[in-house]
């Protein structure tokens, strides 16, 4: 198994509606990306978040699935409208 972890800082001016659209969009990737078996995303409640307000974990069956995730057309469609809204940090790991 492999995991993709992420956290986002919102850029100035991002609305609550846009934030909810991001959460919904990420959750909808599951079932559309081969090998993506679990998606957890939520609002950060930690006082140690350093400005990162949204975080999540995605679990993939294997390295090939993880590698195929980023260029997948469904993911790229999300990225096209998501990136102008966020300052992301990402970590991938084998578990």
Predicted regions located by residue number:
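Short S/T/G/P-rich N-terminal loop/turn motif that feeds into the first structured element of a domain
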Residues: 1-53, 61-71, 87, 92-95
